């Protein structure tokens, strides 16, 4: 039964329905996986989708970077030169681009590890999701500071990009839960090798 559909502030193309199932029964032939194995099945699905969240983050940051770079190259804000000529703006843009490339590389590595099923695939995928999603929120906010109050205007894409980025740490397994249940469990395991994900 559909309980409600969340009317999200961002990521508008993604439907967020809440369902409640009561008294649902099925035959053993229709069970996906094994009885009692649902948690593992769901976690395996998240392994494949976690790098995609990192890639979402890259796309959002890249769009925000392009908007901020264009603004910095064309706006003088009452000065004699475009604001990109000021060190503070250059540093902010350089830091943003560094973060974008770091998330891009981690997400690619994670996706490749999932694709070829390396032993470190789960850890890399989870790091891509957590690091990518949280970095996107921070970087888009930093790029909004480059633009200033104009970034809050509907004519600029930055506000919408931030609204989309804000959901990334929350969906597909919230980052706090990913840290607590998955990454923490990996690191607590007796055979955990912290260098395995390094390749």
Regions from the PLM with identified roles:
Residues 54-85, 93-97:
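Oxyanion-binding "anion nests"
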Residues 72-77, 97-131, 142-152:
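C-terminal helix-coil-helix/basic helical segment that borders enzyme active sites and/or dimer interfaces
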Residues 147-199:
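Glycine-rich phosphate/cofactor-binding loops in nucleotide/flavin-utilizing enzymes
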Residues 1-58, 62, 190-199:
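FAD-binding core of flavoproteins
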Residues 42, 110, 162-166:
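Short alpha-helical scaffolding segments that buttress acidic/His motifs in well-ordered protein cores
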Residues 58, 62-65, 93-103, 107, ...:
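Alpha-helical transition-metal enzyme core signature, strongest for iron centers
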Residues 47-50, 84-95, 121-131, 164-167:
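Alpha-helical scaffold segments that form or flank carboxylate-/histidine-based iron centers
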Residues 5-8, 29-46, 70-86, 149, ...:
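Conserved catalytic-core motifs characterized by acidic clusters
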């Amino acid at each position: 039964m559909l309980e409600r559909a969340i009317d999200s502030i961002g990521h508008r193309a993604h439907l967020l329905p809440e369902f409640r199932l009561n008294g649902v029964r099925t035959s053993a032939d229709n069970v996906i996986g094994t009885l009692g194995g649902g948690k593992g099945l769901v976690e395996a699905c998240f392994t494949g989708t976690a790098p995609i969240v990192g890639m979402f983050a890259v796309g959002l940051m890249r769009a925000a970077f392009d908007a901020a770079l264009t603004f910095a190259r064309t706006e003088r804000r009452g000065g004699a030169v475009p604001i990109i000529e000021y060190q503070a703006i250059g540093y902010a843009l350089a830091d943003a681009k560094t973060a974008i490339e770091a998330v891009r590389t981690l997400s690619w590595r994670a996706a490749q590890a999932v694709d070829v099923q390396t032993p470190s695939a789960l850890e890399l995928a989870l790091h891509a999701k957590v690091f990518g999603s949280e970095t996107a929120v921070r970087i888009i906010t930093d790029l909004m500071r480059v633009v200033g109050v104009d970034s809050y205007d509907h004519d600029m894409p930055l506000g919408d990009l931030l609204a989309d980025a804000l959901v990334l740490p929350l969906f597909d397994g919230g980052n706090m839960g990913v840290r607590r249940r998955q990454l923490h469990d990996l690191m607590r395991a007796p055979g955990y090798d912290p260098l395995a994900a390094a390749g």
